[in-house]
Design a protein with these regions (language model features):
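C-terminal catalytic/substrate-binding lobe primarily of soluble NAD(P)-dependent oxidoreductases
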Residues: 1-189
Length: 189
Protein backbone atom coordinates (compact mmCIF):
# COMPACT_ATOMS: atom_id res chain seq x y z
CA UNK A 1 0.00 0.00 0.00
CA UNK A 2 1.42 3.36 -0.96
CA UNK A 3 2.84 5.34 1.92
CA UNK A 4 3.88 8.83 0.81
CA UNK A 5 7.19 9.85 2.33
CA UNK A 6 8.07 6.38 3.55
CA UNK A 7 11.75 5.51 3.25
CA UNK A 8 11.89 1.74 3.33
CA UNK A 9 15.69 1.75 3.37
CA UNK A 10 15.88 3.89 6.55
CA UNK A 11 17.36 1.80 9.35
CA UNK A 12 15.07 3.32 11.97
CA UNK A 13 11.86 2.73 10.04
CA UNK A 14 10.33 -0.70 9.82
CA UNK A 15 6.71 -1.65 9.53
CA UNK A 16 6.32 -5.41 9.52
CA UNK A 17 5.25 -8.47 11.40
CA UNK A 18 7.47 -10.34 13.80
CA UNK A 19 9.86 -12.54 11.92
CA UNK A 20 10.39 -15.18 14.60
CA UNK A 21 9.48 -16.38 18.09
CA UNK A 22 10.38 -13.85 20.74
CA UNK A 23 9.79 -12.43 24.17
CA UNK A 24 8.54 -8.85 24.01
CA UNK A 25 9.95 -7.06 27.07
CA UNK A 26 7.57 -4.10 26.74
CA UNK A 27 4.42 -6.23 26.69
CA UNK A 28 5.96 -8.97 28.86
CA UNK A 29 4.63 -11.70 26.56
CA UNK A 30 6.03 -14.54 24.50
CA UNK A 31 4.88 -14.25 20.92
CA UNK A 32 5.09 -15.64 17.43
CA UNK A 33 4.46 -14.18 13.96
CA UNK A 34 0.83 -13.28 13.21
CA UNK A 35 -0.47 -14.37 9.79
CA UNK A 36 -2.29 -11.05 9.19
CA UNK A 37 0.75 -8.89 10.05
CA UNK A 38 1.92 -8.36 6.44
CA UNK A 39 -1.49 -6.92 5.50
CA UNK A 40 -2.03 -4.98 8.73
CA UNK A 41 1.46 -3.47 8.54
CA UNK A 42 0.75 -1.94 5.13
CA UNK A 43 -2.38 -0.22 6.42
CA UNK A 44 -0.58 1.01 9.53
CA UNK A 45 2.28 2.35 7.38
CA UNK A 46 -0.15 4.22 5.10
CA UNK A 47 -2.08 5.63 8.07
CA UNK A 48 1.12 6.83 9.71
CA UNK A 49 2.40 8.30 6.44
CA UNK A 50 -0.84 10.16 5.69
CA UNK A 51 -0.88 11.60 9.21
CA UNK A 52 2.80 12.62 9.01
CA UNK A 53 4.09 10.21 11.65
CA UNK A 54 6.97 8.63 9.72
CA UNK A 55 9.63 7.50 10.29
CA UNK A 56 8.58 4.93 12.86
CA UNK A 57 8.97 1.30 13.75
CA UNK A 58 5.88 -0.91 13.94
CA UNK A 59 5.90 -4.63 14.65
CA UNK A 60 3.06 -7.05 15.20
CA UNK A 61 2.79 -10.57 16.54
CA UNK A 62 0.43 -12.80 18.50
CA UNK A 63 1.03 -13.95 22.07
CA UNK A 64 1.46 -17.63 22.79
CA UNK A 65 -1.15 -17.24 25.56
CA UNK A 66 -3.75 -16.10 22.99
CA UNK A 67 -3.02 -19.13 20.81
CA UNK A 68 -3.38 -21.45 23.81
CA UNK A 69 -6.71 -19.83 24.72
CA UNK A 70 -7.98 -20.33 21.16
CA UNK A 71 -6.82 -23.95 21.21
CA UNK A 72 -8.66 -24.47 24.52
CA UNK A 73 -11.92 -23.19 22.99
CA UNK A 74 -11.57 -25.76 20.21
CA UNK A 75 -10.60 -28.65 22.49
CA UNK A 76 -13.06 -27.93 25.34
CA UNK A 77 -15.96 -28.09 22.91
CA UNK A 78 -14.76 -31.25 21.19
CA UNK A 79 -13.88 -29.35 18.01
CA UNK A 80 -17.57 -28.51 17.71
CA UNK A 81 -18.89 -32.06 17.83
CA UNK A 82 -20.24 -31.59 21.38
CA UNK A 83 -22.35 -28.61 20.26
CA UNK A 84 -23.53 -30.15 16.99
CA UNK A 85 -21.51 -27.89 14.68
CA UNK A 86 -18.06 -29.31 13.93
CA UNK A 87 -15.29 -26.88 13.09
CA UNK A 88 -14.23 -27.31 9.46
CA UNK A 89 -10.54 -28.21 9.51
CA UNK A 90 -10.10 -27.32 5.83
CA UNK A 91 -12.74 -24.66 5.18
CA UNK A 92 -13.55 -23.66 1.64
CA UNK A 93 -13.13 -20.09 0.48
CA UNK A 94 -15.64 -17.83 2.26
CA UNK A 95 -16.59 -20.51 4.79
CA UNK A 96 -16.07 -19.23 8.30
CA UNK A 97 -16.22 -20.92 11.65
CA UNK A 98 -19.58 -22.18 12.91
CA UNK A 99 -21.84 -19.62 14.66
CA UNK A 100 -21.10 -20.98 18.15
CA UNK A 101 -17.38 -20.38 17.61
CA UNK A 102 -17.94 -16.90 16.20
CA UNK A 103 -19.90 -15.99 19.35
CA UNK A 104 -17.35 -17.65 21.68
CA UNK A 105 -14.44 -15.76 20.12
CA UNK A 106 -12.92 -12.56 21.39
CA UNK A 107 -9.80 -10.51 20.95
CA UNK A 108 -7.44 -8.40 23.00
CA UNK A 109 -4.89 -6.15 21.32
CA UNK A 110 -2.20 -4.32 23.24
CA UNK A 111 -0.43 -1.44 21.57
CA UNK A 112 2.79 -0.18 23.09
CA UNK A 113 4.19 3.06 21.66
CA UNK A 114 7.53 4.54 22.64
CA UNK A 115 9.38 7.62 21.45
CA UNK A 116 12.70 7.00 19.76
CA UNK A 117 14.63 8.27 22.79
CA UNK A 118 12.37 6.10 25.04
CA UNK A 119 11.48 9.06 27.29
CA UNK A 120 7.74 8.75 26.65
CA UNK A 121 5.56 5.70 26.17
CA UNK A 122 1.94 4.61 26.22
CA UNK A 123 0.25 1.24 26.54
CA UNK A 124 -3.29 0.90 25.21
CA UNK A 125 -5.55 -2.15 25.25
CA UNK A 126 -8.42 -2.83 22.87
CA UNK A 127 -10.78 -5.71 23.73
CA UNK A 128 -13.63 -6.99 21.66
CA UNK A 129 -16.33 -9.63 21.63
CA UNK A 130 -16.78 -12.10 18.79
CA UNK A 131 -14.45 -13.97 16.48
CA UNK A 132 -12.13 -11.28 15.08
CA UNK A 133 -11.94 -12.92 11.65
CA UNK A 134 -15.68 -12.98 10.99
CA UNK A 135 -18.23 -11.75 13.52
CA UNK A 136 -16.25 -8.83 14.96
CA UNK A 137 -14.93 -7.78 11.55
CA UNK A 138 -18.43 -7.65 10.08
CA UNK A 139 -19.58 -5.49 13.01
CA UNK A 140 -16.58 -3.18 12.56
CA UNK A 141 -17.30 -2.82 8.84
CA UNK A 142 -20.93 -2.02 9.64
CA UNK A 143 -19.80 0.74 12.00
CA UNK A 144 -17.46 2.10 9.30
CA UNK A 145 -20.40 2.24 6.88
CA UNK A 146 -22.64 3.94 9.43
CA UNK A 147 -19.91 6.44 10.28
CA UNK A 148 -19.43 7.32 6.60
CA UNK A 149 -23.18 7.71 6.17
CA UNK A 150 -24.19 9.44 9.39
CA UNK A 151 -21.14 11.07 10.96
CA UNK A 152 -18.68 13.71 9.90
CA UNK A 153 -15.70 12.05 8.26
CA UNK A 154 -12.37 13.61 7.38
CA UNK A 155 -12.66 16.31 4.71
CA UNK A 156 -9.52 14.90 3.09
CA UNK A 157 -9.92 13.10 -0.19
CA UNK A 158 -8.08 10.28 -1.87
CA UNK A 159 -7.45 6.74 -0.79
CA UNK A 160 -7.64 6.89 3.00
CA UNK A 161 -7.48 4.21 5.65
CA UNK A 162 -10.24 3.84 8.27
CA UNK A 163 -7.94 5.53 10.80
CA UNK A 164 -7.24 8.57 8.60
CA UNK A 165 -10.80 8.91 7.27
CA UNK A 166 -12.72 8.38 10.51
CA UNK A 167 -10.25 8.32 13.44
CA UNK A 168 -11.99 9.40 16.67
CA UNK A 169 -15.47 9.08 15.11
CA UNK A 170 -14.92 5.38 14.42
CA UNK A 171 -13.35 4.74 17.83
CA UNK A 172 -16.39 6.34 19.50
CA UNK A 173 -18.80 4.29 17.38
CA UNK A 174 -16.98 1.04 18.17
CA UNK A 175 -16.91 1.84 21.89
CA UNK A 176 -20.65 2.62 21.91
CA UNK A 177 -21.77 -0.35 19.77
CA UNK A 178 -23.98 -2.85 21.57
CA UNK A 179 -24.29 -0.45 24.50
CA UNK A 180 -20.53 -0.56 25.10
CA UNK A 181 -20.24 -4.35 25.15
CA UNK A 182 -18.70 -4.82 21.69
CA UNK A 183 -15.31 -3.09 22.08
CA UNK A 184 -13.50 -1.42 24.95
CA UNK A 185 -10.51 0.91 24.71
CA UNK A 186 -8.31 1.48 27.78
CA UNK A 187 -5.08 3.34 28.41
CA UNK A 188 -3.07 1.05 30.70
CA UNK A 189 0.08 3.14 31.12
Amino acid sequence: VLAPGADRSHDGETVAGWDSRRFDPDLRRFGVPFFMAPINARLVRRSLALDGHLPCTYEEGVSVAALLKAAWIYISRGFGYFVGAPIPMQPTSGEGPPPWLQRAGSFCVRVHATTEDRTKSALVEVRGAGDPGYLATSKMLSEVGLALLLDEASPRGGVLTPATALGPVLRRRLAEAEEGRFMQFRVLD
